[in-house]
């Protein structure tokens, strides 16, 4: 065996040795190398040695032949299969050699082998794989695993030990490798699991091309799955700089920018928050680089906020400790970051509330005082998170000492406010120390007003409950807390706050606000314990308590009983008493209430002497209340004390005069007497009062003074008298009063006169109160009738106060002493005497109202009678006669319900409630059924029907009565405001029954209908029930708040609590849709409101079949003529939009067939409708449509794909529609406002690029597929080609660019056609549009066929040569954009672009040559590029030199000049010479001087070529051009000819004499003064060039010419007009003449030079003199 193997090896070795050419050697290696290497596995040592020898020989030959290519596919295949180490080493050596010699052709088989095994042999195959990818196009035939993609992605990182990628990373081709790998990953069908990682790493690449491409791919689809644990772990490893790929056994360094990017991604991942590595990130904060700390702090907050509490809880204490250490160390100075840390503390406590300690609270409150304002916001947020856990705090007694110092030691600090919040939340409401803190805060001298208001929430139970509901963490616990919340016992409060104090000194030593707060809080406690259901204790400032106590006898009794039951009521009464002595309003009113509740034995203890002394000094506003209090107190005293006080008061009255002081005292004394004797009579009787009055004459004098005051013109006297009469007539009979000589009739007549004549409303009101109470003192029907008529005549008085006073008076007349208003004025323990009084005026009063008033056609009387009837039913005790007239009362109230007066309706509804309260048993049930049937049957009783027809008089205006519908229309037309017709007609559109429903509500809302009866009513087995449900639900969303409220009450009362509204949604929606088209705006608006309520929080799929109808009607009402309807419709439209968007977002995440199907259904209904209304005339509709479509597109749902073209069309057109009008205006008037058009164009382009429409368009591009692209193309083509708005065209160009960038393969088939459209439109008159189209063409060149690209670019570039500046600019920009966006195509079309750039950069337009010069500098290699494209450049120049357009011909000449200067013309000298020679024959034209300069440069550059055969021709050309008459051209010609004649190769050209003849004239002063063609600077330049030409044309041996030249110069100097610049030119060119002059000539020449040097301001004059005469130039010149 060994011999055979050796023989084979020898043969192979021989063939290899005999291989003479490199090709034959490579062929043999391809055949024999792999089989030879297999022999390394031979068991025979001799074979192995021979194999090694041959392998070494081959390797030596390969090292000497760098072009040899190895059979890598066979080598790699053998390597991955080899087991023998020796063979592997040799295989590796050959693979290493062959890897660097890979041919530039695809080898997909080798690539697939490498991809299959790269993770097994990364050091061998990874770099080879990347090299192979560079020369291969992505194809689905090549497969790759996720792990391999992960390994390949690491190519963009730096390996810490630099073992794997070092060759490629430092290669000159590294950018190509990086780009090719990116493209493969993006375009191939490889698994997408790790593609994002390659983009992610490459986005931070140091090579901008790579980073830019990676960013494009990332935007397209390259985001990690942030809920994929493997992705998240990689990101966390990157953030921690611990990224490792196990398959490569390598760790990689990651830049800080990438680590920050990784954290930015993690800030969106919930799963990341639940990993141990996330906790490591938190621990890493202090050690992290400063630039990473902000992101890590944000991530910490994210982790704490999003982590599973069960995961985070064991680590919470450590994290809290870490955060506190960071904050205390002050390493983090940023306010924002410190704020994040404080917020994180709050979030941590949500995870583990055991972290909440008083120490932590103290720390946070202290920080709140010391940190900057921006950080305090976050601390406050953290404290707000912590607060709810204190609502069930375990150590309340330990907490209060922590909080109090922050509140009282620094009341102005933010910590004080926060500490107060904890006081409000952490303690039960009945915890007195906490309430006491709130009370102590009520001191305006120490605490700010807002702080006081916050503390008041801790003194009001309902506000406290509402405040605590915000901080609820557990709904059930919160309900228990609210249920258990109660005011503390009033006795406990009094004992806690007042028992240990001298109450008089307490008032004097503390702020009044603090004392008053205590009083108010104790009163709330009393009322709370009396009856919690009434919630009197929570009425702000107890403002309504007096009115309620007047109207509710039971409540008065309950409060009285509660006061008596207080063990320390005396202490509280004394406290209020001393507050009253200080003349504060609140204590005075409170004491008035309390003495009415208190039994006589309690009131007896109050020191009346102190009060009597003070009462005369009370302000007028409190005087009546104070004297009433004193009257009650005195009435409980013994007879002696009463007699003494009354005697002193009588004395004051008798000694009074007209001085103010005495008058007020007398007035006060009258009040004291009146109240005292009244309450004495209330306790006993009127006859017993006589025993307290020692002198009967005094009482007569008292009544006499009262009557005198009543008739006085002084208002105070009158009101005082009325107040006393009002009280007296309640308790004293007519007989008792007349026994003292009082004329009862006279008093009544005075009062009736006042009602008619006095203008003061308050006096009239008091008169009504008095005359109604006069009826209590007699039973005379005739007198009662007189009083009744006096009350009746007040109905026409237009004052609400008088109206309500008349109703009270009417009820008192009817009800007598048992009337609620009468009983409420008497102290509760004195009311027993009132029960003995009787009155029988009830029947005739009720009859009068029902018969003479209710059915009156007078609106004011009906208004008054409705209130009178209500007051009698509500405030008089029911009698037998009430039941007799019950049916009449009922129908009267129903008749009031159909009145158009809201007040009458409300009154009637209250009357129905009052009737309901009067009835019992079957009568109450019958009443309830009747009302319900009235609504359900949609009818009104025949007696109450009030129909409207065309001739019904509805209301009146200042133009008269509006009687008919026709009159309404006329009035609206004449008013000039047609909108009014809707307001007017809405009245006719609402039946009287509708108005009745509003009134019925209050009555029905109080009916306690059983649930069974409700279910029976709404059983929906009849159309009546269904109709009722629809109407009730719609009516309770009426635009009128009162109607809506009352209808809501009806709904709550009539509709079963367990009604399943969802099952009836369809029918309710149909009803609303019907009424949204109603002529009545109220129907339309209520229907809109109903839909908002009905569809809120309902998935759109529940009403998808009705969605289009709903949306259609909502858009219709959005453009309603009534503003309130429009305003109501906007929330409905937003609701529908939000529902569609949310439903579509859910289906975006649900990729199951059912989810996709649901998404398609939603889109198929919503989008066609929205697109149809995208061009609606109503601005609001368009705006809403736009916002909805935008949000739908943002969901990225694939079901939108088929609608994307239409959406894109709308967005493109919206770009123009919603462009700022200012931009359009300025575009038309730019010149008028001296604004550069370029600035306007840039602003408009920027606005388009940054607009929300472009964002939507970009999202749409991501949703396109082949089918939708087919639809989009004609739309896009039309947008580009048709005339339209500038923004739309710019947007269309942007779309084309985005399509190429993001969806290149998709747009490729349409690229050619789009290119044609853009080509036709790119020369738009608007520069911004042209620029955008040119840019789009640049992008399209990437994906269109090369032939089309060449043709298109050629046609656009050809426009340059037409000479139009705008077209030239566009052509230039296209070239730049092609080089920038399609560099490969640009290079392939280099023969087109480079010659054009070279030609165009010589344009005389700055905007053109600037662009193209920069492009030439960046893209070309100067002379090399010129030489490479010399043939194309010459043809281009030659073509444009023969045209007649100077703005094209001149650049051609300039280009030719540069071409001559920079190119190598070894083989093209004759062609250039012929071209120059022919073009020089033309007459002078602007720019020909450049041609002459090019001609001279060519002559100087190639003298041998010229001298051989062209000298004579050159002589003719130079002479001809020298003699041209065009003065401007001649100046340049002198310079060029001078340059040629100065060249040593052309010394034989003798043009000395010609030069003097042509140039001498220009040195004459006569020419200088007369020539008008040139300006001064041009004349000086011409003279300089003349000097230059004459001096350089000088030749030796021509004495005459020398003399002529010196004469010209001397004469010019003699005339002393030469500019110093011309003199400097003479000095500069002097050496030419010095060489050829004789000594005699030189003397004259030296004088000329001296005169040129003398006084020449240029420093160069000295330098030129030194060149001619050496260092001693000055002495030489002077001599």
Curated annotation (Swiss-Prot):
GO terms for molecular function: molecular adaptor activity. Keywords: Cytoplasm, Nucleus, Proteasome, Repeat. The keyword Repeat applies. Its main location: cytoplasm. It is found in: Cytoplasm; Nucleus. Signal peptide: none annotated. HEAT repeats lie at residues 27-64, 66-103, 105-142, 314-354, 355-392, 394-431, 513-551, 697-734, 742-780, 840-878, 884-921, 1023-1060, 1089-1127, 1160-1198, 1202-1239, 1267-1305, 1309-1346, 1467-1504, 1509-1546, 1600-1639. It holds the Pfam family ARM_ECM29_C. One of its GO terms (biological process) is proteasome assembly. GO terms for cellular component: cytoplasm; cytosol; nucleus; proteasome complex. InterPro entries: ARM-like, ARM-type_fold, Ecm29_N, HEAT_ECM29. PANTHER family: PROTEASOME ADAPTER AND SCAFFOLD PROTEIN ECM29, TRANSLATIONAL ACTIVATOR GCN1-RELATED. Stabilizes the proteasome holoenzyme, probably by tethering the 20S proteolytic core particle and the 19S regulatory particle. The proteasome is a multicatalytic proteinase complex which is characterized by its ability to cleave peptides with Arg, Phe, Tyr, Leu, and Glu adjacent to the leaving group at neutral or slightly basic pH. The proteasome has an ATP-dependent proteolytic activity. Belongs to the ECM29 family. Component of the proteasome. This is Proteasome component ecm29.
């Amino acid at each position: 065996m060994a011999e055979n193997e050796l023989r084979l090896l020898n043969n192979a070795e021989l063939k290899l040795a005999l291989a003479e050419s490199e090709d034959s050697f490579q062929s043999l290696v391809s055949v024999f190398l792999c089989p030879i290497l297999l022999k390394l596995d031979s068991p025979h040592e001799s074979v192995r040695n021979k194999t090694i020898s041959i392998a070494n020989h081959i390797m030596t030959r390969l090292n000497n032949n760098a072009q040899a290519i190895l059979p890598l596919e066979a080598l790699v295949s053998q390597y991955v299969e080899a087991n023998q180490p020796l063979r592997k080493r040799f295989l590796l050596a050959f693979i290493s050699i062959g890897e660097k010699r890979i041919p530039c052709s695809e080898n997909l088989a080798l690539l697939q082998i490498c991809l299959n095994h790269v993770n097994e042999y990364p050091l061998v195959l990874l770099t080879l794989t990347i090299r192979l990818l560079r020369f291969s196009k992505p194809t689905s035939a090549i497969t790759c695993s996720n792990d391999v993609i992960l390994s390949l992605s690491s190519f963009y990182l730096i390996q810490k030990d630099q073992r794997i990628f070092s060759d490629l990373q430092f290669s000159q081709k590294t950018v190509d490798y990086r780009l090719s790998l990116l493209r493969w990953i993006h375009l191939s069908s490889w698994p997408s699991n790790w593609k994002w990682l390659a983009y992610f790493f490459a986005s931070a690449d140091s090579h901008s091309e790579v980073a830019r491409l990676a960013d494009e791919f990332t935007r397209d689809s390259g985001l990690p799955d942030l809920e994929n644990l493997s992705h998240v772990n990689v990101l966390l490893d990157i953030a921690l700089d611990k990224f490792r790929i196990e398959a490569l056994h390598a760790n990689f360094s990651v830049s800080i920018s990438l680590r920050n990017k990784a954290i930015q991604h993690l800030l969106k991942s919930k799963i990341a928050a639940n990993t141990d590595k996330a906790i490591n990130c938190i621990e890493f904060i202090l050690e992290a680089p400063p630039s990473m700390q902000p992101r890590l702090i944000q991530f910490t907050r994210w982790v704490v906020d999003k982590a599973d509490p069960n995961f985070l809880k064991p680590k919470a204490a450590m994290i809290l400790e870490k955060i506190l250490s960071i904050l205390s160390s002050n390493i983090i100075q940023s306010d924002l970051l410190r704020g994040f840390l404080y917020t994180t503390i709050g979030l941590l406590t949500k995870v583990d509330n055991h972290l909440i300690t008083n120490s932590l609270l103290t720390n946070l409150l202290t920080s709140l005082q010391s940190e900057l304002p921006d950080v305090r916001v976050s601390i406050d947020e953290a404290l707000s998170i912590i607060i709810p856990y204190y609502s069930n705090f375990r150590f309340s007694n330990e907490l209060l000492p922590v909080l109090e110092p922050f509140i009282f030691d620094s009341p102005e600090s933010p910590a004080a406010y926060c500490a107060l919040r904890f006081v409000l939340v952490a303690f039960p409401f009945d915890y007195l120390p906490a309430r006491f803190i709130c009370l102590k805060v009520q001191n305006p001298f120490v605490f700010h007003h807002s702080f006081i208001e916050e503390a008041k929430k801790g003194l009001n139970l309902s506000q406290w409950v509402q405040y605590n509901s915000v901080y609820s963490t557990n709904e059930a616990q919160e309900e228990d807390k609210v249920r258990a919340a109660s005011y503390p016992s009033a006795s406990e409060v009094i004992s806690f706050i007042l028992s240990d104090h001298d109450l008089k000194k307490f008032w004097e030593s503390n702020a009044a606000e603090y004392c008053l707060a205590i009083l108010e809080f104790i009163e709330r406690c009393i009322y709370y314990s009396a009856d919690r259901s009434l919630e009197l204790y929570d009425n702000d400032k107890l403002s309504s308590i007096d009115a309620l106590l007047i109207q509710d006898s039971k409540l008065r009794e309950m409060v009285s009983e509660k006061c008596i039951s207080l063990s320390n009521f005396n202490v509280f009464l004394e406290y209020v008493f001393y507050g009253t002595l200080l003349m504060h309003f609140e204590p005075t009113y409170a004491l008035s209430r309390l003495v009415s509740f208190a039994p006589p034995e309690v009131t007896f203890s109050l020191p009346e002497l102190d009060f009597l002394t003070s009462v005369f000094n009370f302000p007028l506003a409190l005087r009546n209340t104070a004297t009433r209090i004193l009257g009650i107190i005195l009435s409980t005293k013994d007879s002696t004390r009463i007699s003494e006080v009354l005697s002193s008061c009588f004395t004051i009255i008798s000694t009074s005069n007209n001085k103010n002081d005495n008058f007020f005292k007398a007035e006060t004394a009258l009040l004291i007497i009146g109240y005292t004797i009244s309450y004495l009579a209330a306790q006993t009787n009127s006859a017993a009062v006589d025993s307290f009055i020692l002198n009967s004459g005094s009482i007569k004098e008292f009544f006499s003074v009262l009557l005198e005051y009543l008739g006085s013109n002084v208002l105070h006297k009158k009101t005082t008298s009325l107040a006393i009469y009002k009280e007296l007539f309640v308790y004293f009979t007519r007989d008792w009063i007349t026994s003292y000589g009082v004329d009862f009739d006279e008093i009544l007549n005075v009062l009736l006169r006042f009602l008619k004549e006095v203008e003061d409303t308050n006096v009239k009101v008091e008169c009504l109160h008095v005359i109604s109470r006069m009826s209590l003192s007699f039973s005379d029907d005739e007198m009662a009738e007189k009083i009744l008529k006096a009350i009746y005549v007040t109905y026409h008085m237009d004052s609400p106060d008088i109206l309500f006073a008349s109703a009270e008076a009417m009820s008192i007349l009817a009800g007598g002493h048992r009337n609620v208003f009468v009983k409420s004025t008497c102290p509760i323990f004195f009311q027993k005497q009132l029960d003995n009084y009787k009155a029988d005026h009830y029947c005739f009063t009720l009859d009068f109202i029902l018969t003479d008033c209710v059915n009156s056609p007078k609106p004011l009387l009906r208004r008054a009678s409705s209130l009178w009837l209500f007051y009698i039913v509500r405030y008089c005790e029911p009698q037998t006669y009430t039941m007799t007239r019950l049916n009449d009362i009922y129908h009267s109230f129903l008749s009031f319900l159909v009145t158009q007066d809201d007040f009458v309706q409300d009154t009637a509804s209250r009357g129905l409630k009052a009737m309901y309260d009067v009835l019992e048993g079957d009568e109450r049930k019958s009443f309830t059924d009747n009302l319900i049937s009235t609504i359900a049957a949609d009818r009104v009783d025949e007696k109450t029907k009030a129909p409207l027809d065309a001739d019904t008089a509805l209301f009146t205006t200042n133009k008269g009565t509006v009687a008919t519908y026709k009159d309404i229309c006329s009035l609206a037309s004449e008013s000039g405001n047609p909108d009014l017709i809707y307001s007017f007609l809405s009245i006719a559109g609402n039946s009287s029954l509708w108005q009745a429903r509003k009134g019925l509500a209050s009555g029905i809302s109080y009916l306690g209908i059983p649930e069974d009866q409700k279910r029976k009513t709404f059983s929906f087995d009849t159309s009546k029930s269904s109709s009722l449900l629809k109407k009730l639900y719609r009516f309770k969303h009426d635009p009128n708040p009162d109607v809506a409220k009352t209808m809501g009450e009806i709904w709550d009362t009539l509709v079963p609590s367990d009604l399943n509204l969802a099952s009836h949604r369809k029918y309710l929606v149909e009803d609303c849709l019907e009424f949204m088209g109603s002529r009545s705006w109220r129907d339309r608006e209520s229907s809109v409101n109903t839909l908002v309520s009905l569809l809120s929080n309902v998935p759109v799929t529940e009403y998808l079949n009705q969605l289009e109808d709903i949306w259609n009607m909502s858009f219709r009402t959005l453009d309603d003529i009534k503003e309130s309807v429009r305003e109501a419709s906007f929330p409905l439209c937003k609701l529908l939009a939000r529902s569609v968007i949310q439903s579509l977002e859910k289906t975006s995440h649900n990729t199951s067939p059912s989810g996709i199907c649901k998404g398609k259904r939603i889109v198929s209904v919503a989008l066609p409708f929205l697109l149809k209304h995208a061009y609606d005339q109503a601005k609001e509709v368009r705006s809403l449509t736009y916002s909805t479509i935008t949000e739908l597109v943002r969901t990225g749902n694939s079901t939108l794909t088929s609608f994307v073209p239409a959406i894109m069309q709308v967005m493109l057109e919206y770009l123009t529609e919603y462009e700022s009008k200012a931009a359009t205006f300025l575009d038309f008037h730019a010149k008028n406002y001296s604004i550069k058009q370029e600035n306007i164009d840039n602003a408009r382009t920027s606005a388009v690029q940054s607009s929300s429409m472009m964002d939507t368009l970009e999202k749409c591009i991501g949703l396109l597929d082949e089918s939708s692209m087919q639809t989009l193309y004609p739309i896009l083509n039309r947008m580009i080609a048709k005339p339209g708005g500038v923004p739309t065209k710019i947007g269309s160009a942007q779309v084309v660019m985005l399509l190429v960038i993001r969806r290149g393969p998709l747009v490729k088939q349409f690229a050619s056609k789009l290119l044609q459209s853009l080509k036709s439109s790119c020369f738009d008159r608007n520069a911004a549009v042209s620029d955008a189209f040119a840019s789009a063409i640049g992008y399209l060149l990437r994906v269109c066929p090369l032939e089309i690209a060449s043709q298109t670019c050629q046609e656009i570039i050809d426009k340059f040569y037409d000479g139009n500046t705008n077209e030239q600019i566009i052509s230039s920009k296209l070239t730049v954009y092609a080089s920038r966006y399609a560099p490969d195509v640009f290079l392939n079309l280099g023969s087109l672009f480079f010659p054009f750039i070279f030609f165009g950069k010589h344009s005389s337009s700055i905007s053109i040559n600037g662009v193209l010069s920069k492009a030439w500098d960046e893209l070309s290699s100067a002379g090399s590029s010129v030489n490479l494209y010399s043939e194309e450049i010459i043809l281009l120049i030659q073509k444009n030199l023969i045209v007649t357009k100077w703005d094209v011909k001149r650049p051609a000449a300039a280009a030719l000049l540069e071409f001559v200067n920079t190119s190598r013309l070894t083989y093209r000298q004759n062609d250039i010479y012929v071209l120059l020679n022919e073009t020089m024959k033309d007459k002078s034209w602007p720019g020909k001087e450049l041609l002459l300069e090019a001609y001279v440069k060519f002559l100087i550059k190639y003298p041998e070529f010229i001298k051989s055969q062209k000298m004579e021709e050159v002589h003719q050309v130079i002479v001809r051009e020298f003699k041209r008459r065009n003065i401007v051209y001649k100046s340049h010609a002198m310079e060029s000819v001078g340059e040629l004649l100065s060249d040593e190769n052309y010394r034989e050209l003798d043009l000395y004499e010609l030069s003097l003849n042509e140039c001498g004239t220009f040195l004459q002063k006569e020419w200088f003064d007369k020539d008008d063609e040139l300006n001064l600077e041009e004349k000086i330049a011409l003279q300089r060039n003349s000097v230059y030409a004459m001096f350089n044309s000088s030749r030796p041996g021509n004495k005459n010419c020398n003399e002529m030249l010196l004469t010209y110069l001397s004469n010019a100097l003699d005339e002393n007009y030469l500019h110093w610049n011309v003199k400097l030119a003479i000095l500069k060119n002097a050496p030419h003449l010095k060489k050829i002059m004789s000594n005699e000539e030189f003397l004259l020449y030296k004088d000329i030079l001296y005169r040129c040097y003398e006084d020449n301001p240029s420093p160069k004059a000295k330098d030129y003199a030194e060149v001619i005469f050496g260092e001693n130039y000055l002495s030489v010149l002077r001599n």
